[in-house]
Amino acid sequence: MVKRNFFSFFFILLIPAAGMAQDWPQAFTIELEEVTYTEWPALQSAAAASHNGRWFLLGGRTGGLHGLFPPNTFPLDEANQAIHMLDPQTGAFWSRSVYELPDSIAVPLRATNAAHVHIGDYLYIMGGYGQDMDDSSMVTFNTLIAVDLAGLEPAMESEADIQPYFRMLRDSVFYQCGAEAEVMYHDGQPLVYLIGGHTFTGEYTQIGLGFEQHYRNNMQLFSIEDDGATLAITAPVTMEDSLLYHRRDFNVAPIISKTAANGEALVALSGVFQYDANLPWLNSFEIFKDADDSVRAVMAEMEHRFNNYTCPVMVMYDSLLQRNHLLLFGGISQFVYNTATASVVEDLNVPFTADISVVTRIDSAVDATTAYTQDLLPVRFEGLYGSNAAYFPAPDFPKYSNGVLKLPEARTPLLAGYLFGGIDPEIPNFGPSTATNTLYEVWLTYTAPIASLSDAAAEDVRIYPNPAQDFISVFVPGEGKVLLEWVNVVGETVQTETVFSGMAATIAVPDAAGVYLLQITDMAGAQRVLKKILVY
């Protein structure tokens, strides 16, 4: 049975609220359609991967938010003890018990908040927090589990033996929970970035007694060497930073970067906890490779107020305006939108939220600088959705090699991805919660913004070369579309072009030699700039 519900997120609405995106140029619209398969398992905080149109989810929890006071704050019967394969097209699903595997693999597969990466046909699951081998105590695991998705898929369908498709090794590198892992390619080879996290031994309690906890305060870089039989890693490179990497339960996402040597970077967003308060970090940082092949992490100039904990993140790049847009769906947030007062308020209890925000990274059109902003979308989830839910990209949406969506390709509505599962709380703070099997389709449409030339003086428009023979390069300040019209000496418009301002555009000159006026007009027709050009 499929439960359907449809609602849209239009990126511009005039809502007079601080932090809302009412003054932003409209770059896209988002539409969400709920397509929940009611028979699917409810799950949160799982390691997830997509392969051959099927989704695989391992680990995590089948209950809601963990308890705050002992005993049994992470009960074993709420640990996910199954391996799930889901088909979003048909609603079919298959589940197998982890106990079909050796205990050395089955036990860490019951853990929650493990880091994971998907490389080729393999899902690699690192660490996590859960009950140990004899179910007597709570521990952090030091395991790397390799899951052969290409082999596991037919075994799940045919009820064949699944054990050949799981392998495991132990190493202190993986001794963590709450870390985030991503992959960037160096010289064509995947390099794993394992960022932040902590080790936690003993039963969790909010009063801070009876357990040992240590933040890792580092980022470790290594390659996984896997020929399908032997599993190993290269010697890790460890980067220490007691500010940047002192966080857990956050989000890390790939972006397109003009400043990085290989054209891509990672952004680590918010997370918890600050040294002197049980509050999220209101900052984020960028990780990239320099021209000398060294890796750097740099704080982003932005106050990250919304969607502070792990939640689904969808990343799009607008190559025309040179902007990354990172959509953060729900979760847990220190700042929330108050519908009664139509304003953003701070809640130091850090509640579950229905808010959806967009973090935008803006590349300068004229130099190597970048800027970050974060805004709330003017439409919210109907419920408190998103905490520890999974995001799956749609396989057919055009993407860059690092998985970032090519935003301008969505000139008509395209299915961009899915949101699945997560925690389903009844109220924002201190209330009961369960895991959910809610499933959303995310539809994306690119809508190019309209430029305004009202502040663009004629001297700010740059044209080269002039005189010109075949082509010219035109740079118009601002953002959005502008109309270029070639007008000859008798006042006839002989050629028109539509280009985007804020970036250089190369256009052909008219075929006939002569003197022309290039008339540059914003799409509202409110402002014009004239430039005289000699074509020979």
What is the predicted role of each segment?
Residues 23-36, 47-100, 132-140, 148-157, ...:
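Beta-propeller domains
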Residues 23-36, 91-104, 150-172, 224-243, ...:
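Blade-edge beta-strand/turn elements of extracellular beta-propeller
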Residues 61-63, 129-131, 198-200, 272, ...:
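Residue-level signature of beta-propeller blades and closely related beta-rich strand-turn architectures
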Residues 72-91, 137-155, 207-228, 280-294, ...:
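Beta-propeller blade signature
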Residues 306-404:
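Loop/turn-rich, solvent-exposed surfaces of beta-rich toroidal or solenoidal domains
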